């Protein structure tokens, strides 16, 4: 039997007096709440049952583990490897890639991980996948777009402040700024409504890594992502992608202000076709690896 086991919220040594362990526990809960529908979508090519406990895993099962803070769990993986006929990992988080995970990953038949780094781009054991969209974000299919651009997030870096400075004069726009990650956020339904009503979504780099949820939420909701071209990250992750890429936000200002309706509609369609095709390709690849 193929079983799916979410393990992100089950943290080893969950001592809340230890700040690192407490943070890992909170991140594990966050991943389960916010990435479950993305993982479900990319696993469409696999028939599986969900197990809530490793106690339900039986000898000979094919196991798919979704996990984070994996550097702490190598003994658990070694034990499961002895029981299962095959074992696969979806590794969430790990933006900074601080740990050498060679000894962890070798317990698995194959690994998919978010937040790609140089050593994983050409790996035979590991494939990088998008961080995906937040669970519940969906296209409201609003034809007439109310906003030229939108920003939803924390302006924690100079690049983000420059983004807001450059684009603030362009109306109409929607701007929801938070002081801290995941604090005073808008609901996913409101976000879906806003993004589905927006033409362009500037997607600045994340705090540690270039990738963020916003790129994929833009694609899900039919608006055009504008990404920073740092290290040509998105071209390495997605060759021939249709994203608009800029080196500085003043370039985005001219583009958002000057693009005509036909240009916008053409790029929206291009992004939608590419994203739908990409998701089918990753579903097929995962299905072939696991089945």
Locate predicted features:
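Acidic, PIN/NYN-like endoribonuclease modules and their adjacent C-terminal/linker elements
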Residues: 240-259
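Conserved donor-nucleotide binding/catalytic region of nucleotide-linked donor-dependent transferases
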Residues: 254-274
């Amino acid at each position: 039997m193929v079983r799916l086991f979410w393990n992100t919220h089950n943290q080893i040594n969950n001592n809340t007096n230890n700040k690192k362990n407490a943070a890992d526990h909170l991140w594990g809960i966050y991943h389960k709440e916010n990435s479950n529908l993305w993982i479900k979508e990319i696993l469409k090519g696999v028939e599986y049952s969900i197990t809530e406990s490793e106690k339900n895993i039986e000898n000979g099962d094919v196991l798919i583990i979704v996990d984070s803070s994996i550097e702490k769990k190598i003994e658990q993986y070694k034990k499961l490897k002895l029981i299962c006929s095959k074992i696969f990992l979806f590794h969430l988080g790990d933006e900074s890639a601080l740990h050498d995970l060679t000894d962890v990953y070798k317990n698995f038949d194959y690994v998919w991980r978010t937040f790609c780094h140089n050593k994983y781009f050409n790996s035979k054991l590991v494939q990088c996948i998008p961080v995906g969209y937040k669970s519940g974000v969906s296209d409201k299919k609003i034809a007439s777009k109310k906003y030229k651009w939108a920003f939803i997030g924390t302006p924690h870096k100079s690049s983000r402040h420059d983004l807001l400075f450059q684009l603030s004069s362009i109306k109409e726009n929607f701007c929801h700024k938070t002081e801290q990650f995941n604090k005073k956020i808008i609901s996913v339904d409101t976000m879906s409504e806003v993004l589905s009503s927006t033409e362009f979504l500037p997607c600045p780099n994340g705090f540690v890594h270039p990738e963020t949820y916003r790129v994929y939420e833009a694609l899900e909701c039919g608006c055009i992502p504008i990404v920073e071209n740092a290290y040509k990250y998105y071209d390495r992750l997605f060759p021939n992608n249709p994203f608009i890429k800029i080196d500085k936000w003043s370039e985005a200002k001219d583009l958002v202000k000057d693009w005509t309706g036909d240009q916008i509609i053409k790029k929206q369609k291009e992004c939608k076709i590419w994203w739908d095709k990409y998701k089918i390709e990753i579903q097929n690849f995962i299905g072939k690896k696991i089945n």
